[in-house]
Amino acid sequence: MAESHLQSSLITASQFFEIWLHFDADGSGYLEGKELQNLIQELQQARKKAGLELSPEMKTFVDQYGQRDDGKIGIVELAHVLPTEENFLLLFRCQQLKSCEEFMKTWRKYDTDHSGFIETEELKNFLKDLLEKANKTVDDTKLAEYTDLMLKLFDSNNDGKLELTEMARLLPVQENFLLKFQGVKMCGKEFNKAFELYDQDGNGYIDENELDALLKDLCEKNKQDLDINNIPTYKKSIMALSDGGKLYRTDLALILSAGDN
């Protein structure tokens, strides 16, 4: 199935989903190591078997990752390599997904109740807005298909809604600073203790200066995961979740809390 899709001159959204599932063997949401090398090998073989040249995007991709053991790509990168249908591809090229800060602002717009989740209807509106900003419209059937596929692609725990970290897979890997914070998340008890420690004036929220102090300490303790030189970027992106400069516990928990365990 994947071979025939890789030979197509135009890959539909549902075919793209099937290709992704085929190669993301461990369901991590990323292709790396053997998964990535399998993709490169099968892509080259499929195109050759069909008598097709690699497209310029495919050649660049093979040159960049073919000889690397440490390569890692997400859904966004693959969507740019394969000849994916235009409207679906636009979802990965929109301005709101060019940087983590813009992504956080977009998240805040749609997670209106600060629940930490975007549910099906909210996701549908989010995708509709992205396409409209690119001056594209799709009918309700196609929009429902895209919404369903996005849930299948990103909803790793199959609860029918997307958490911030799941939704962030719409970002290119190099832009997704949330990946860095996966290794430094705290259990609920530790997070609450840290929040109260850095909420120095006890007003129930953390401001930019308090966040700066928290990030500096986190970087010092987790040098393998976090780069202290990137604090301005981390801070800008996290503060995009704030309410007028006030970063409440539930907002910061999206980044730093791993839950109650």
UniProtKB/Swiss-Prot annotation:
GO cellular component: cytosol; dendrite; GABA-ergic synapse; glutamatergic synapse; hippocampal mossy fiber to CA3 synapse; neuronal cell body; nucleus; postsynapse
Ubl conjugation is among the record's keywords: no
Residue numbers carrying N-acetylalanine: 2
Its job: Buffers cytosolic calcium. May stimulate a membrane Ca(2+)-ATPase and a 3',5'-cyclic nucleotide phosphodiesterase.
InterPro entries given in the database record: Calbindin_Ca-bind (IPR051001), Calbindin_six-EFh_dom (IPR029634), EF-hand-dom_pair (IPR011992), EF_Hand_1_Ca_BS (IPR018247), EF_hand_dom (IPR002048)
One Gene Ontology MF term: calcium ion binding involved in regulation of presynaptic cytosolic calcium ion concentration
GO BP of this protein: locomotory behavior; long-term memory; metanephric collecting duct development; metanephric connecting tubule development; metanephric distal convoluted tubule development; metanephric part of ureteric bud development; retina layer formation; short-term memory
Residues the entry annotates as binding Ca(2+) 1: 24, 26, 28, 30, 35
Keywords: Acetylation, Calcium, Metal-binding, Repeat, Vitamin D
PROSITE patterns according to UniProt: EF_HAND_1, EF_HAND_2
Quaternary context: Interacts with RANBP9.
Family recorded in the similarity comment: Belongs to the calbindin family.
Stated name of the protein: Calbindin
Binding site for Ca(2+) 3: 155, 157, 159, 161, 166
CDD domains: EFh_HEF_CB
Domain comment (free text): This protein has four functional calcium-binding sites; potential sites II and VI have lost affinity for calcium.
Binding residues for Ca(2+) 2: 111, 113, 115, 122
Residue ranges, annotated region (Interaction with RANBP9): 2-7
